[in-house]
Amino acid sequence: MVKPNETEFKQKISIIRDQFEVCTPYLTTLSDPVRQKILLILAESGTDGMDVQDITAKISLSRPAISHHLKILKDAGMIISHKKGTQVYYFIYIYKALDKIINLVNTVLNLVKNIDMESIKEKAPWMLNSPSN
């Protein structure tokens, strides 16, 4: 495996740093179990969408709490809403967020795959015996 030069490595790290910055709001939003449940409920509803009352019936939280989580999901660009009369229906729309997260994961994976194994053997042999290998 070719050992990347220091400039190339620093450029890759800079790209990853920028990608983490872009993905942090998405990852933070996804880290909450209630928001995960809401996303799954909305995914199940498909193109029908759901209003706050329907979502509240499926999750043991108050309407204001559900509304709070919906606002966070909407602000993060993971759901969209559509008003029908007096009702607001919510729909999953997580494509952009997932695309950014997938790009980050792939960039990190490519960097890690290109780490020179000889350098690891020489400088950090303990990494080869870690339980996650």
How would you label these PLM feature ranges?
Residues 74-84, 91:
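Beta-hairpin "wing" of winged helix-turn-helix
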Residues 21-62, 88-97:
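N-terminal helix-turn-helix DNA-binding core of bacterial DNA-binding proteins
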Residues 57, 68, 74-75:
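Alpha-helical residues within the helix-turn-helix
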Residues 2-22, 43, 93-133:
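Amphipathic alpha-helical dimerization/coiled-coil segments
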Residues 65:
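Conserved H-loop
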Residues 40, 68-69:
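Base-recognition residues in the alpha-helical recognition helix of bacterial helix-turn-helix
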